[in-house]
Amino acid sequence: MRNCIESLLPGGEEVEIIIVDDGSTKDRTAEIADEYAAKYPTIVKAVHQENGGHGQAVNTGLKNATGLYFKVVDSDDWLDKDNYPKVLAKLAELVHQGNAPDMMICNYIYDKQGAKHKKAVRYASAFPLDEVFTWRDVKHFRLGQYILMHSVIYRTHMLKECGLELPKHTFYVDNIFVYYPLPYV
């Protein structure tokens, strides 16, 4: 979890980090969340709730989000130190130009613990690279080229307006999180 949070901190004041403690009892999640919130009070917010599962944790994060964009980063995930600033800079540039996208899709690496190889999922063959596009510009996806929760950044207001609410006590809510908002993009 610390690795995850540390990977987000370089975003500085441009990023709002919401740590949702989903009723953890067998680890130090609550303590670590409070520690970071105390150390970085203008960036990190710790939210504690009874266990509601992954979907409810995402709902709580979204409910507490005040930033322009919303991205789910699970506690065992981290953002690449070289690409994270580029993503933030691109979003800032688009917003400054008055062309704020509802959704940004980013490549990601699936690094399963114990696996011999990492799996890189890239979208260059399906989406135009480094430009704003519409659904008409989307090409065919390759096998294994899924859009997952880890690859999307949504405009917060749009997510709230579309009424996205993930089921409680449910894991693998990626498809709902990714695909429910698409008609609003």
Where are these regions (language model features)?
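Nucleotide-sugar donor-binding/catalytic module of glycosyltransferases
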Residues: 1-185
